[in-house]
């Protein structure tokens, strides 16, 4: 299965378009879509994005709850209700809507971060801060598991 991996920082052009990194476009094409499904992250001041596989995962998550239950309605509103279907143009670009840009505080640059089954779109400075915090949490986790090897920059040690 193809995955979204690596990190890329790209500029928005004068028309507000941003190029999706070529490796990510390849994954989306193999997923059988020319649309980018994008919604405000539920966990971070960033955007979650992906193709039909991401939408299938969202559907599976929502389907765990009984129809018309409060939890199902809230998840559906938070995920389906805020997902934008962005058309990918022939040059591999999308236009982020104002509501998406506002949620993630995006102005003229974005950082794409692969998360395997999906990717996240960040304002670059916010991502740098998030990554520093995430690395510290991983170091603490490794120490708590007794796997600190002195090589704290590597997950595998």
Curated annotation (Swiss-Prot):
Compartments it resides in: Cytoplasm, Nucleoid
BP GO terms, sorted: negative regulation of DNA-templated transcription initiation
Listed SUPFAM superfamilies: AbrB/MazE/MraZ-like
Keyword Oxidoreductase part of the UniProt annotation: no
Record-linked PROSITE patterns: SPOVT_ABRB (PS51740)
Stated name of the protein: Transcriptional regulator MraZ
Alphabetically ordered keywords of this record: Cytoplasm, DNA-binding, Repeat, Transcription, Transcription regulation
Main subcellular location: cytoplasm
One Pfam family here: MraZ
Domain SpoVT-AbrB as annotated: residue spans: 7-54, 83-126
Species whose genome carries this gene: Azorhizobium caulinodans (strain ATCC 43989 / DSM 5975 / JCM 20966 / LMG 6465 / NBRC 14845 / NCIMB 13405 / ORS 571)
An MF annotation (GO) of this entry: DNA-binding transcription factor activity
Cleaved signal peptide residues: none
InterPro entries: MraZ, MraZ_C, MraZ_dom, MraZ_N, MraZ_sf, SpoVT-AbrB_dom, SpoVT-AbrB_sf
A single Gene Ontology CC term: cytoplasm
Family indicated by similarity: Belongs to the MraZ family.
Superkingdom of the organism of origin: Bacteria
Gene3D superfamilies: Transcriptional regulator MraZ domain (3.40.1550.20)
Assembly mode: Forms oligomers.
Lineage of the species this protein comes from: Bacteria, Pseudomonadati, Pseudomonadota, Alphaproteobacteria, Hyphomicrobiales
